Curated annotation (Swiss-Prot):
InterPro entries: Calcineurin-like_PHP_ApaH, Metallo-depent_PP-like, MPP_ADPRM. Belongs to the ADPRibase-Mn family. It comes from Arabidopsis thaliana (Mouse-ear cress). This is Manganese-dependent ADP-ribose/CDP-alcohol diphosphatase. CDD domains: MPP_Nbla03831 (cd07396). Its EC number is 3.6.1.13, 3.6.1.16, 3.6.1.53. Zn(2+) 1 binds at D17, Q19, D64, H257. It catalyses: CDP-choline + H2O = phosphocholine + CMP + 2 H(+); ADP-D-ribose + H2O = D-ribose 5-phosphate + AMP + 2 H(+); CDP-glycerol + H2O = sn-glycerol 3-phosphate + CMP + 2 H(+). Monomer. GO terms for molecular function: ADP-ribose diphosphatase activity; CDP-glycerol diphosphatase activity; metal ion binding.
Amino acid sequence: MGSAARQPLFSFGVIADVQYADISDGRSFLGVPRYYRNSILVLQRAVETWNQHGNLKFVINMGDIVDGFCPKDQSLAATKKLVHEFEKFNGPVYHMIGNHCLYNLPREELLPLLKIPGRDGNAYYDFSPTPEYRVVVLDGYDISAVGWPQEHPNTIAALKILEEKNPNTDKNSPAGLEDVARRFVKYNGGVGEKQLQWLDSVLQDASNSNQRVIVCGHVPMSPGVASKAALLWNFDEVMNIIHKYDSVKVCLSGHDHKGGYFVDSHGVHHRSLEAALECPPGTYSFGYIDVYDNKLSLVGTDRMQSTDFEN
């Protein structure tokens, strides 16, 4: 019985990689079917289910709201359409940016649409749903070859990393790269120095306030939870900061689509969520997380696997 018999401190909805586009079904580079028009139906079912639950404090969308294959003259309308569907949830919705978001719209347009409270184009932020908890949302495309203007220092830094780490002409290809070096591809990104300092200060503040922390980011932060080609460029730097604090219990991500779960050497739970995009018609992938004082419990629907994160 234990905590399962008690009421959670709070609960929140989760969904990842909706990647809607008004185009025919296709396949990923690995040949996995993608159901571009159906994904909005997955989201609609998710919102209905979350509202029926009646006690979800908020929803987190783990990024990639619209797909990169969305015709560019439809990018703005498609993003607005999906945001409108999310806003049918009876509560706050927190978004983060993924690579597919940035293939469609520049940050200056995207952040206001998604109501991301960043400054100067930055998309990282934190909030406290209850006094006991802090939620941190990272911007995994802070250092990125997409989304910033071409002359922006973050674009230049990203292109330099790709030039140094990836010898392929196609910088989206990990061909010839081995193990975790496969992460140095254009569709991934990194967390910049300013954001690293911010993360450290937020975690220090949470620790001083005896708050537990849930870290969210579109791009996975551990080689144990996702494909080596779907990792944050500087996951090691981010995790070195996170591991300084006992307060961080869970790192949630999307991006890798197939889903994954891993507990690292410091006892931090990593969970990459199954993509809404890859649900055949009539199937679904979304869920909600019950947060207790001593554990978190992901209650998944259909293709999203339920997971207990025991502290």
